[in-house]
Amino acid sequence: MPGNTFGHVFRVTTWGESHGPAVGCTVDGCPAGLPLDVADIQRELDRRRVGQSRVSSQRREADEVQILSGVFEGRTTGTPITMLVYNTDAKSHHYENIKDRYRPGHADYTWDAKYGFRDWRGGGRSSARETIGRVAAGAVARRLLATFGITLVGYTLQLADLRAEVFDEAEIERNIMRCPDARVAALMVERVDQARRELDSLGGIVEVRARGVPPGLGEPVFDKLQADIGKAMFSIPAIKGVEIGEGFGVAMLRGSQNNDPFIRRDDGTIGTVSNHHGGILGGISTGEEIVVRLAAKPPASIAQPQQTVDRDGNPVTIEVHGRHDPTVLPRLVPVAEAMLALVLADHLLRQRLARVTWEDRSDD
């Protein structure tokens, strides 16, 4: 089964299933000498962990990461970094009575259509639990980016029709919705509680920003920076739409409105007055803030009766019980940050291979 590896230079392979013994990843291509501690990875995994609030799945997992290779005495060795998280609270019996019934909105049918055989326990490889490996790898990428002054911040921008109206970065980790608007965050929690009582779920939008990205990252023509960002984000379970900068809003603008005038800043660097382009032009970073938005569908696992068919095509009714997220948004935030970090780390290393300057050459 191909498709488990992401990146060109900074390469990440994830592995494992939702109800298997463990999940994890291997990072290859990380330079040697990068300071890295298990706490760096655990911090990000804790943000993604299930059961952390009433707006997430009540599955109880510690998600304690183990670094098996690639790190010695607190620094990366330049060899593959393998990280592992054991699954300790899988309850496969919740799926016994529906294993031959196709859950609406899930990948059950499509995986059967492709492989003719699938792990039906909790969605197997198609489960969002696979994203543990992404978040662990993203934590390594973030440490690398930090050495170049690049930082990322993600947050819940919108839940259903409730949209943040204020951006207070300090507020993001203070509320369980990870929303930068405290007032709207409280309304979001109430809406999620209502959906849970009604045995339903809610979608929304997560936004991620990257700051300090130097100009010049991106590989024309088919590996444009926004193309790789789009692939990264669309590979996350539940994502149905991705925007960069003004996104679909550009359809309503004139060129005179959408163009961002260039200026020379006081420090001598080139920048733009506005940022409709979201930090990318021609597939290459401009040095402005990179702004990405992801539209997430409502989680497909709901306990309402739904019409479907079984593997033989017979009409049946299904109710999906178990421990499921009423919305993915708060736990999606660290996953989206991780995927953007992986793209930027990969392109940062690729850029260092793109050209040789006279300053890079040593005297003979």
From Swiss-Prot:
User: Which GO terms are recorded in the biological process aspect for this UniProt protein?
Assistant: amino acid biosynthetic process; aromatic amino acid family biosynthetic process; chorismate biosynthetic process
Q: Which GO terms describe its cellular component?
A: cytosol
Which InterPro entries has this protein been placed in? Chorismate_synth, Chorismate_synth_AroC_sf, Chorismate_synthase_CS
Cofactor(s) for this UniProt protein: FMNH2
Q: How is the cofactor bound?
A: Reduced FMN (FMNH(2)).
In the UniProt record, the signal sequence range is none
Assigned EC number: 4.2.3.5
One Pfam family, please name it.
Answer: Chorismate_synt
Keyword NADP attached = yes
What residues bind FMN, as annotated?
R125, S126, S127, G282, K297, P298, P299, A300, S301, R323
Keyword field: Amino-acid biosynthesis, Aromatic amino acid biosynthesis, FAD, Flavoprotein, FMN, Lyase, NADP
Under SUPFAM superfamilies, the record lists: Chorismate synthase, AroC
Q: Where does NADP(+) bind?
A: R48, R54
**Catalytic activity, per the record?**
5-O-(1-carboxyvinyl)-3-phosphoshikimate = chorismate + phosphate
Q: Please, which domain of life does this record's source organism belong to?
A: Bacteria
Q: Which GO terms describe its molecular function?
A: chorismate synthase activity; FMN binding
Report quaternary structure and partners: Homotetramer.
Record's family? Belongs to the chorismate synthase family.
Role this protein plays: This reaction introduces a second double bond into the aromatic ring system.
Entry protein name = Chorismate synthase
Q: What is the lineage of its organism?
A: Bacteria, Bacillati, Chloroflexota, Chloroflexia, Chloroflexales
Gene name in the database record:
aroC
